[in-house]
């Protein structure tokens, strides 16, 4: 994973994350046993697509150089939970989704912190808040699964 030296690098990476999230939630929705959870996951696909569109719009408008570079090591700490194995059961997938949303929220917080452009800072803070809300949903779903197992 390369270091980020430009706004374009950051936005392109964030767009790829949102695309991966869409695929992740599409696949996870097929594993959901509860129809309301499957519907929520489908809604998340739509939300992640909206994030992608917002980021793409900014990418088309921006191309500035960052005052501070963001290292690949810093970013890689937040990006690990994207691929869903076909053998993953629903409980494991929900746990993975919690981790993914935590990672995305933290990544967007880091990106917001290094932005000198207020529009980009606000965009990444909003994305961070939304990803953290998604994490709360998955925490509740994971708890529900664990309680139903006992």
Enumerate the language-model features and the residues they cover.
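Non-heme di-metal
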Residues: 1-150
């Amino acid at each position: 994973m390369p270091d980020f030296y430009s706004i374009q690098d950051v936005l392109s990476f964030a767009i790829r994350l949102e695309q991966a999230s869409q695929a992740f939630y599409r696949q996870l929705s097929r594993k959901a046993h509860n129809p309301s959870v499957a519907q929520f996951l489908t809604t998340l696909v739509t939300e992640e697509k909206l994030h992608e569109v917002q980021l793409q719009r900014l990418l088309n408008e921006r191309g500035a150089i960052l005052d501070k570079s963001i290292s690949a090591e810093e970013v890689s700490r937040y990006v690990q939970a994207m691929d869903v194995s076909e053998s993953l059961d629903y409980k494991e997938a929900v746990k993975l989704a919690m981790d993914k949303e935590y990672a995305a929220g933290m990544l967007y917080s880091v990106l917001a912190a290094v932005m000198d452009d207020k529009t980009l800072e606000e965009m990444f803070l909003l994305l961070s808040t939304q990803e953290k809300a998604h994490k709360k949903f998955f925490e509740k779903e994971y708890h529900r699964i664990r309680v139903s197992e006992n």
